């Protein structure tokens, strides 16, 4: 059975939430939780070509471009670059 793009994105989003909630030591406060889930989902979807590619920050994380990652990250995302990198290498293609 083949999943639609929206179903694939929802699968990735659930994997990202599971990773944040159960598989990583970084505590994401409620105030940042939705942002981190959305950016993490965009990173994984961009990596696997699901839907449309993410913006400049997401592209720089996926492309392993450290300087661009830090220069395009806002204050919130800068705190979670380590988490995003761990997601990138530990969340499989849905």
Predicted features and spans:
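Amphipathic alpha-helical interaction modules
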Residues: 20-72
């Amino acid at each position: 059975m083949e999943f639609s793009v929206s179903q694939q994105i929802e699968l990735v989003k659930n994997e990202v939430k599971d990773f944040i909630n159960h598989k990583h030591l970084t505590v994401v406060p409620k105030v940042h939780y939705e942002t981190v889930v959305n950016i993490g989902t965009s990173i994984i979807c961009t990596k696997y070509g699901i839907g449309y590619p993410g913006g400049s920050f997401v592209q720089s994380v996926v492309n392993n471009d450290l300087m661009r990652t830090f220069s395009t990250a806002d204050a919130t995302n800068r705190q979670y670059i380590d988490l995003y990198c761990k997601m990138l290498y530990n969340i499989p293609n849905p």
